[in-house]
């Protein structure tokens, strides 16, 4: 259900805007998207896991807020990110 430290580090290096960048919206959205994807796969076999479903909804909301912020601050970075992640918007 959770992502491994190696996978998280790969995402950080791929989406970082500079060296050592772990807090930019791009990195946070990429990590959240990976976690959301893993939880979505989890729900295919565990349909009644409502406790984890609440966590999924919180992650989706957090990602939405980060994307809204990025869209407001720098629309070009927002466009690049949703294209790279394959998010529909």
From Swiss-Prot:
CDD domains reported for this sequence: Ribosomal_S15p_S13e (cd00353)
InterPro entries, A to Z: Ribosomal_uS15, Ribosomal_uS15_bac-type, uS15_NS1_RNA-bd_sf
GO molecular function: rRNA binding; structural constituent of ribosome
Entry annotated with the keyword Ribonucleoprotein: yes
Keywords recorded for this protein, A-Z: Ribonucleoprotein, Ribosomal protein, RNA-binding, rRNA-binding
GO cellular component, one term: cytosolic small ribosomal subunit
GO BP annotations listed: translation
KW DNA-binding (keyword) present: no
Database matches in NCBIfam families: S15_bact
Protein family (similarity comment): Belongs to the universal ribosomal protein uS15 family.
Function: One of the primary rRNA binding proteins, it binds directly to 16S rRNA where it helps nucleate assembly of the platform of the 30S subunit by binding and bridging several RNA helices of the 16S rRNA.
Subunit structure: Part of the 30S ribosomal subunit. Forms a bridge to the 50S subunit in the 70S ribosome, contacting the 23S rRNA.
The name this protein goes by in its record: Small ribosomal subunit protein uS15
Organism in which the protein naturally occurs: Bartonella bacilliformis (strain ATCC 35685 / KC583 / Herrer 020/F12,63)
